[in-house]
Design a protein with these regions (language model features):
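A generic structural signal for short
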Residues: 80-81, 102-103, 132
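A structural feature recognizing the 12-helix transmembrane core of secondary solute carriers
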Residues: 97, 103-105
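Substrate-recognition "cap/lid" segment bordering the active-site pocket of phosphatases
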Residues: 106, 110-144
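N-terminal helical cap/lid subdomain that shapes the substrate entry/recognition surface
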Residues: 2-91, 99, 110
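Structured helix-beta-strand junction loops
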Residues: 43, 99-100, 124, 131
């Protein structure tokens, strides 16, 4: 019997909050990073609502609305491939594979982001489903 384990990538495997907060602090200053992160959390679902934007476009538009200068509106998209996994994740994923589990990612991002993050994780996945390719962001039913 094949056993599958599915994961969200960002916030589960990759430290999304840490990565985005560091970049927001770089762009807006550490004193404003938490407020900008809270505002980002409000903006993201609105920007994903129709399912037609790539995640790169979501990140860029969010930064524009947060007031980033033109030169930094793509800062989150540029930095995302470098965001680190949570420390315990690579070993846990490898253990799951060693025990016969097949690994899959369901993500609200784009293929290039997932491929970069999978490389950082250092453990192969059998499958990755990304929002832009299916025209749906979680938690919409179409994503499942």
């Amino acid at each position: 019997m094949k056993r599958w384990a599915t994961f969200d990538c960002y916030g589960t495997l990759i430290d999304w909050n840490g990565g985005i907060r560091r970049e927001l602090a770089r762009v807006f200053g550490d004193d404003h990073a938490d407020d900008k992160l809270a505002r980002y959390h409000d903006l993201e679902p609105e920007l994903q609502a129709d399912g037609t934007r790539s995640y790169r476009e979501v990140l860029t538009e969010a930064m524009r609305r947060l007031g980033a200068p033109d030169t930094d509106q793509d800062a989150l998209a540029r930095s995302l491939p470098d965001w680190e996994p949570f420390p315990e994740v690579p070993a846990a994923l490898q253990e799951a594979r060693d025990r016969g589990w097949k690994l899959a990612i369901l993500s609200n991002t784009d293929r290039d982001f997932i491929e970069a993050s999978q490389a950082r994780l250092g453990v192969p996945f059998e499958l990755a489903i990304v929002a832009f390719e299916i025209g749906s962001y979680k938690p919409a039913h179409r994503h499942w």
